[in-house]
């Protein structure tokens, strides 16, 4: 059974719970990650969440999101999920937003509540989606996509919308985004990365 790391407001681990039971009307704060994968042309790989997902089914979002297992290093968790969901290998995995946090509520009241460090990476692969996780994929020009997200003219997951607003502040070219200091990760992630 897949487990997620529960957090306090300071980002310290306070326990674990089964992933299958964590998302509900009063979802506890937990540790996650988001990854934005680009190709050599600077295009972002977008994914459509599988229609069977408990949270935001069928919604388009960034390349990959997930939860590190207890004591699992963030890079290993990201590499694992990219392989499981999309059959991708990546290079230059870079921490870019170490303390991103959000809370979002679906129309049915189910809550997502995460401290979710954001990473960027690059690939030469084409995705081979696992249909249990990903309903569709598309490559999108970063500048056009980010402009549409900021203008509110494209439907995208709530976390992706908030992340894009912060990512554009890092610069126009994702290949030149500065690496964040891993010491700025929440304590639970630093412990997991040890």
From Swiss-Prot:
Cofactor binding note of this UniProt entry: Binds 1 Mg(2+) ion per subunit. The magnesium ion binds only when substrate is bound. Binds 1 Mn(2+) ion per subunit.
- Report the EC number(s), separated by commas if there are several: 5.3.3.2
Q: Which CDD domains match?
A: NUDIX_IPP_Isomerase
Q: Which Pfam families does the entry link to?
A: NUDIX
Domain Nudix hydrolase: residue ranges: 28-162
Its annotated pathway reads: Isoprenoid biosynthesis; dimethylallyl diphosphate biosynthesis; dimethylallyl diphosphate from isopentenyl diphosphate: step 1/1
Any one Gene Ontology MF annotation carried by this entry is: metal ion binding
Q: Which UniProt keywords apply?
A: Cytoplasm, Isomerase, Isoprene biosynthesis, Magnesium, Manganese, Metal-binding
The record ties this protein, via InterPro entries, to:
Idi_bact, IsopentenylPP_isomerase_typ1, NUDIX_hydrolase-like_dom_sf, NUDIX_hydrolase_dom
User: Is the keyword Metal-binding in the record?
Assistant: yes
**Cofactor(s) for this UniProt protein:** Mg(2+); Mn(2+)
> Which SUPFAM superfamilies does this UniProt record tie to the protein?
Nudix
Q: Name one GO cellular component term.
A: cytoplasm
**GO biological process entries:** dimethylallyl diphosphate biosynthetic process; isoprenoid biosynthetic process
Q: Where does Mn(2+) bind?
A: 23, 30, 67, 112, 114
Localization (cell)? Cytoplasm
- Catalytic residue list: 65, 114
Q: Which reaction does it catalyse?
A: isopentenyl diphosphate = dimethylallyl diphosphate
Give residues annotated as binding Mg(2+): 85
Highest taxon of source: Bacteria
Known function: Catalyzes the 1,3-allylic rearrangement of the homoallylic substrate isopentenyl (IPP) to its highly electrophilic allylic isomer, dimethylallyl diphosphate (DMAPP).
The Swiss-Prot or TrEMBL record describes its family as follows: Belongs to the IPP isomerase type 1 family.
Q: Which PANTHER family match?
A: ISOPENTENYL-DIPHOSPHATE DELTA-ISOMERASE
Q: What is this protein called?
A: Isopentenyl-diphosphate Delta-isomerase
Q: Which organism is it from?
A: Saccharopolyspora erythraea (strain ATCC 11635 / DSM 40517 / JCM 4748 / NBRC 13426 / NCIMB 8594 / NRRL 2338)
Species lineage, top-down? Answer: Bacteria, Bacillati, Actinomycetota, Actinomycetes, Pseudonocardiales
Question: What is this protein's gene name?
Answer: idi
């Amino acid at each position: 059974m897949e487990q997620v790391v529960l957090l306090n407001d300071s980002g310290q681990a306070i326990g674990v719970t089964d992933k299958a039971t964590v998302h509900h009307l009063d979802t506890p704060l937990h540790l996650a990650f988001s990854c934005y994968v680009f190709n050599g042309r600077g295009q972002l790989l977008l994914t459509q969440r599988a229609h069977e997902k408990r949270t935001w089914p069928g919604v388009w979002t960034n390349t990959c999101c997930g939860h590190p297992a207890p004591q699992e290093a963030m890079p290993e968790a990201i590499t694992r999920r990219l392989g499981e969901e999309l059959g991708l290998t990546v290079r230059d995995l870079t921490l870019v937003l170490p303390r991103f946090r959000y809370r979002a509520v679906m129309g049915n009241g189910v809550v997502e509540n995460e401290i979710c460090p954001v990473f960027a990476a690059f690939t030469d692969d084409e995705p081979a989606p696992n249909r249990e996780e990903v309903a569709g994929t598309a490559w999108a020009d970063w500048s056009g996509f980010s402009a549409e997200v900021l203008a509110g003219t494209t439907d995208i997951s709530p976390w992706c919308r908030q992340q894009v607003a912060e990512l554009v502040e890092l610069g126009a070219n994702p290949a030149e985004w500065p690496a964040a200091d891993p010491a700025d990760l929440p304590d639970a992630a630093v412990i997991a990365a040890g």
